[in-house]
Every structure is written in C-alpha cells, then in structure tokens.
Amino acid sequence: MHVDDIGDPWTVADATSWVAAALGETEWVQVGALLRTDFPASTLEALAAGRRRLLVDAQGLVRLARVGPLARDAYIDPSSFRSLAVLKLNEGEARILAGGVEPEHLRALGVPEIVLTLGSAGALLVTDSHAERIARVPVEGIVDPTGAGDSFSAAYISARARGAAPVEAARAANALAAELISTA
C-alpha cells in the first residue's frame, strides 16, 4: 500500500458542528482512520461527547502519516484510547500497540472492550474482567478478505446497539465477516 497524499485531520470543530448534527442521537460510532493523524485524541473525545460510544479500528493508529510506502510503528498518544468504548485490532496491530496478543497485553491499553480479530482462527474478546475466544466460522470457497475488518466492526456495533452483550456481538460480527469474505 502506498500513501500518495495526506488530507486534513478531523477536528474538534468538525466533531462538534456538522458531524454532531449528522450523528444526531446516534449512540454508536465506528471510526476507521487510514493514518494516525486523521482523528487526534481531542477529536475522538468530541465525537464521544454525550452518550456516544466509539469503536475505533486500530489500523489507522499504527500507520505513520507520511507520503510514500505505508509504514507502521508503535508510538501512539495514550490519550487516544481515553474516549474509546471498543478497540478493534488484528494480531499485527496488537503486537505493535500492546506488545502482544494476550489478554493482559490488551487490557493494558485501558479500553473497556477490545476485539482482536484472528482471521481464520476467529477472534478474542477482552474486557476488564473477562476474556473469551470466539470460535472460527468455517468459510467455503475462495476467500477475499477485502472489507472483513470493517464488516466485523459494523456488525459488532450494530449488535451492541441492539443490546447484545460484548461476547454475543463478537460472535455475530465474526459470523458476518466470515460470510462476507466467502465467494462460494
């Protein structure tokens, strides 16, 4: 992947004006940044104002904001996690941000709900008091993983918005992502 240009970051003014108007009474918001500078911590806090809960995909948190080949590193402003309800990350992102994929590594990030996607091995849900492996869902046919993470995140917050517990939401998200990547 290659970054050709870097746009302006989302600002607190964006989050408190036109974005707030567009969101209205929305309770759950999915944030999927391309680069770590797309949503500064202050903007995430503004997006989480009131009763909104944020799910942030970690892919943007580990990507450097520079033109050229996509590069990743571990530096992240710890305040970026302060306003998150859910952090969704894959194994590579977990190793970069948390130093590992074990529940204790993930809990150290301080996010109430963390969902670690494990590709064909399922997922791992980690909360302050609980960790549960989400079983893999068999996939038939040729697999195209394009959009699997975004689909997982959308299904997770959709289930949570309907009142599902985190583990139920993770199971639903895992099932939907498996269905969407199969071309059978």
What are these regions (language model features)?
Residues 8-10, 62-64, 139-141:
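A short acidic, often aromatic-flanked loop/helix-cap motif at beta-alpha or helix-coil junctions
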Residues 25-27, 51, 83-85, 111-112:
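Short, well-ordered alpha-helix to beta-strand connector turns
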Residues 32-105, 121-122:
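Conserved beta-alpha-beta core of the PfkB/ribokinase-like small-molecule kinase fold
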Residues 22, 97, 180:
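Residues that form generic nucleotide/phosphate-binding pockets
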